[in-house]
Amino acid sequence: MLACVAVSAGSVDKETPCRCALPCHRSRYKCPEEASSPSHDCSCTDSGNWFLIDWPQVAAYTMIGQLKAQTAYEGVKTLAANGVEGDIVELGVWKGGVTMLLALAAARFRNESLPRRHLWAYDTFEGLPEPGIHDDAKARDIYRALANHENTTEVHKRKRMGLISADNKWNVGAIAEVMTNVGSVLNERRAVPTVHFVRGKVEETLLDPRNVPSRIALLRLDTDWYASTRAELAILWPRLAVGGLLIVDDYDNWGGARRATEEWMKDEHIPGPRGVV
């Protein structure tokens, strides 16, 4: 499950479809193909159908399921329709599948009255760091088994899923591989967003102002552990635009992410997740 918090979202304007290669709405949106191929004449499709076109391109590079993926994808469309300014930020990208999907959505659903969105992808790109004392026992046990080269049931399961590297690192997505994966979808699109890759533990990289966007429209947290999630919420939440979307992917999967989120909600006087998928 994931926790979604929408920040004082405004009303969605009605859409007026036109005929072009990507969805566009004459008063608010511009299709990247429109200027370069004015004679192009294929019927526009709603975002649900565009998701079904884009999802197969990225599914092999993410661990999340189709429902979670579509939630994020539709979020990008809603942000554009509502005129919410800001960048798209993902922390914990593994092999880049969700980053790829968000880039495709940002290219498909553009609001010409807004500055061009950038994408930010944060990860160690060397696998999950060691969980801390505020993370659940399961996470610590798996990490300890990997460090000791023990093939426990949980370790074996993750090896079968392709989540453990040959050198016993957990959830490794090398930065060169991720950049190649993301580039494979960006190269096919005009008007694609700029993608910033920030390498290192987020508790450290987020302390450098150069690594942090000034305004965020969509904030997706997927780093699993308590310390990273707590740092992300503390530093990035104040930059989330009114009407922006916060997604905590592992709210119901890992105790550390859930604890960090609930502590932050209490500190910020937020009553609780407003949508759980």
Regions picked out by a protein language model, each given a short descriptive name:
Residues 1-8, 12-70, 76-84:
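Rossmann-like AdoMet
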Residues 32, 40-66, 84-277:
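S-adenosylmethionine/decaboxylated-SAM
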